[in-house]
Regions:
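Conserved P-loop NTP-binding catalytic core
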Residues: 43-123
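Coupling/switch segment of ABC-type P-loop NTPase heads
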Residues: 73, 107-206
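A structural signal for short, well-ordered beta-strand segments and their strand-loop junctions
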Residues: 128-131, 213-218, 226, 304, ...
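Switch/communication elements of ASCE P-loop NTPase nucleotide-binding domains
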Residues: 1-55, 224-350
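RecA-like P-loop NTPase motor core
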Residues: 291, 295, 310-413
Length: 413
């Protein structure tokens, strides 16, 4: 499917600095220091997309500009202080606001905006903003119901925002429908389709929770789903950890949209904006979340913000822009997280305690009076953590070992 955003031109929030971000239809990862304006920027991108695509304001621009010229002429020919003059003045002010809503920052270059607008009208095209503070609100199911959902709910601002809350209800409906397809209707094809959907959902749970023992268990007496996992008490969608709740606030909404429309998730397109995509996530999940969403909903273009080097290095199909540096970085998927931490953020991947030990070893290596015993004591403090040392730390560790050998063998520096 076509990805629609080609370029974003804007001023950095709270500054006069103009920036141009080239997306070329790729995902966008925004990074930068706290207070650099990432959240303000993604908020403004979302509002602009709503204005120019969902509200069709881009289509109206030429008409507004023509109307403005008309009212400027009316004002010119009217006597100041007259009702005609006041009417013209008010119309010009109104049209200025409408024109400004399209032409003001950010300026978003869209590849085939009419096609994007058509897809949004059909509800296959999404324009979603998931704020930094997000938790899933998946509701309990009380009974089984049909799966012919009202597509009109997607157009309604209130009900459309809550479709993700119906995930457990949808699962109950699918289990019930599968049972009827076997016992009442003898519909083998339907039974296989539902079984595959549920199996795929189970596989997604295993992937996200990094545990092959994870599976859904349905309590048919209470219309309740439990997530079972070896070594843990069964738990529900209502008491997910904050990290998984953050993920499901995104996943359940997009998944339920495809179910409302009775299409594969791969048929959805548009733009999903996720502020602080790494919020509350363990580092292993930070590596997985953007690739997972990109593979689950491949037609959607993602714009995300993050501080995490694990997110920055997790995908190759993304442009990365550092707002603090006003710099487009490009693909970082081939870089280690240590090099990203130090190169992009200027932060060492080693802890303060480790850095102190390394500095001490470096001094001893340079000191001609250092004894093998002193170096061996320092090396022993590091070797238990050798597997997790960064490149610089491993270099000094090996240099210390080399110095010990030279001293013992009587070799000069």
């Amino acid at each position: 499917l076509k990805k629609f955003i080609e370029k974003i031109s804007t001023t950095v929030p709270y500054t006069d600095d103009q920036i141009d971000i080239e997306l070329h239809g790729k995902n966008l990862i925004l990074t930068g220091s706290n207070g650099s304006g990432k959240t303000s920027l993604v908020d403004s991108i979302y509002k602009k997309l709503i204005d120019i695509v969902r509200s069709k304001k881009l289509d109206e621009l030429k008409g507004w500009e023509k109307q403005k010229l008309h009212w400027i002429g009316q004002r010119y020919n009217a006597q100041e202080g007259s009702s005609k003059y006041q009417q013209a003045k008010q119309q010009i002010e109104r049209l200025d606001r409408e024109i400004d809503s399209v032409t003001s920052n950010p300026n978003i270059t869209i590849n085939d905006h009419l096609e994007f607008s058509r897809m949004v009208d059909s509800e296959l095209g999404v324009i979603e903003l998931f704020p930094a503070v997000r938790q899933s609100q998946i509701q309990d199911a009380r009974s089984a119901s049909g799966t012919n959902y009202n597509k009109g709910d997607l157009n309604n601002q209130r009900s459309g925002a809550q479709i993700g809350n119906q995930l457990e209800q949808h699962l109950v409906n699918l289990y019930t429908r599968r049972s009827f397809s076997i016992t009442e209707h003898r519909n083998e094809e339907l039974e296989q389709d539902i079984t595959k959907w549920l199996s795929d959902f189970d596989d997604n749970l295993k992937f996200l929770m990094e545990d092959q023992s994870v599976h859904l268990n349905f309590d048919a007496d209470n219309f309740k789903f439990y997530i079972k996992q070896d070594g843990k008490e069964p738990y529900t969608f209502q008491n997910l950890s904050s990290g998984y709740s953050s993920i499901f606030s995104v996943l359940s909404k997009l998944l339920m949209r495809s179910e409302y429309l009775k299409v594969s998730p791969s048929k959805l397109c548009g733009v999903a904006i996720i502020d602080e995509i790494d919020a509350h996530l363990h580092v292993t999940l930070q590596r997985k979340i953007l690739p997972f969403l990109s593979e689950s909903f491949p037609g959607i273009q993602y714009i995300v913000t993050t501080h995490s080097p694990f997110v920055l290095t997790s995908v190759s199909n993304a442009e990365i822009y550092d707002i603090s540096r006003r710099e487009q970085v490009g693909d970082l998927s081939s870089y280690s997280y240590e090099s990203v931490l130090e190169g992009l953020f200027g932060v060492s991947s080693a802890s303060d305690i480790l850095q102190n030990k390394i500095r001490e070893i470096a001094k001893k290596i340079e000191d001609e009076n250092t004894s093998p015993g002193e170096l061996e004591t320092l090396i022993n403090k590091l070797e238990s953590n050798q597997d997790i040392l960064d490149e610089e730390s491993r270099f000094y560790l090996n240099s210390a070992k080399l110095k010990i050998n030279k001293i013992k063998n009587g070799v000069g520096e």
